[in-house]
């Protein structure tokens, strides 16, 4: 079995993780206490897992460990430096599902400070986390890698994540590390120092993370408002939407399908150069139940929708950049012939530009397991869905927005004393800023055509 370990860090990571496990339970036909649903229960709930129940339980083993009495336990760790959010999980509706030793909390908050999460408070918790991870890894037959959920704006999500990811790359250097990171958005902000935290984390994990799927709160808010008709979205709405995207991305790891995508394949197909590892995620259909009743979810429609900026998880315009790679993950009632036709149509469109050194650029994944939906959720229940993971130069706008805000504060050395007071050196700020400036230049250069670079001259002799 090719197992995957999920690590949820900080308030944001834990709440997204909780929403993901809620969805996985529905998809695999598992009760809140970890027991498998009976065939009668599955039929009554209309779950897609009712078809081939034994297969579904087998498929779940990538993400779940099975105990002696048949109970399914998430192969997952929840970490926070203060107890409040973890206590909510301990007392929540899924309290019987998680292994109590895999819910790890400290005593003191990171207070939105990267340096506290990484250097002072984080150091007290890191050994507990790594020893628990070691225990989980030892129980795996063939560990594929890690999925890490966190925000880049909070103290724990930024600082502790960078500390842990460094440890992981030392202890599990050959294993894949995929991040789902919530980026500070241009308008929606929860802390003044978010640009500092986000830039410092991006810098410190640059050489350790293999692939970072970025999500931006503002983009998710807008989807809830405009596409799903939720007037005042709460975090619960946002997290459930993110969970649906994570579920589509990981469906091929959890279910057997005709054209499945392995954890390492994401990296191989999406990351042309080690530093350019920030794919953009899009999902379709994004609509409420009322609208869905009047829509036809044809494969072509879903594929085209994934290239619209309103379906992207980061505020950016895909038409302003060039695509280096594109991974289309279809699930549900999907026929390969229709997929090929839809992708061919996309390739012929003028406004979707690929870099000239990567002319084909499409990786297709098809999974016949229909998407599951949380009861009373915002998304319409549909028989098929499409998730697009693309590496595009358009995402560099997220870094330039962040750099601009970072510069405004750092010019005045605002709030820097809080970081230095926790054992961090001021030079790390400058180092991080320079690294991100180089990253922005990398994106620019990657988007240049060979002709523009004058690269063809080198090959004249051939």
Swiss-Prot record:
Enzyme Commission code: 3.6.5.-
Binding site for GTP: 11, 82, 151, 155-156, 190, 217, 239
Acetylation is among the record's keywords: no
Active site residues per record: 265
Catalytic activity entry: GTP + H2O = GDP + phosphate + H(+)
A Pfam family matched in the record: Tubulin
Binding locations of Mg(2+): 82
GO annotation, cellular component aspect: cortical microtubule; cytoplasm; microtubule; nucleus; perinuclear region of cytoplasm; plasma membrane
Any Gene Ontology biological process: pronuclear migration
Cofactor: Mg(2+)
The keyword DNA-binding appears for this protein: no
Keywords: Cytoplasm, Cytoskeleton, GTP-binding, Hydrolase, Magnesium, Metal-binding, Microtubule, Nucleotide-binding
Subcellular location: Cytoplasm, Cytoskeleton
Complex formation: Dimer of alpha and beta chains. A typical microtubule is a hollow water-filled tube with an outer diameter of 25 nm and an inner diameter of 15 nM. Alpha-beta heterodimers associate head-to-tail to form protofilaments running lengthwise along the microtubule wall with the beta-tubulin subunit facing the microtubule plus end conferring a structural polarity. Microtubules usually have 13 protofilaments but different protofilament numbers can be found in some organisms and specialized cells.
Family as reported in the entry's similarity comment: Belongs to the tubulin family.
Function description: Tubulin is the major constituent of microtubules, a cylinder consisting of laterally associated linear protofilaments composed of alpha- and beta-tubulin heterodimers. Microtubules grow by the addition of GTP-tubulin dimers to the microtubule end, where a stabilizing cap forms. Below the cap, tubulin dimers are in GDP-bound state, owing to GTPase activity of alpha-tubulin.
Protein name (database record): Tubulin alpha-4 chain
Gene (UniProt): alphaTub67C
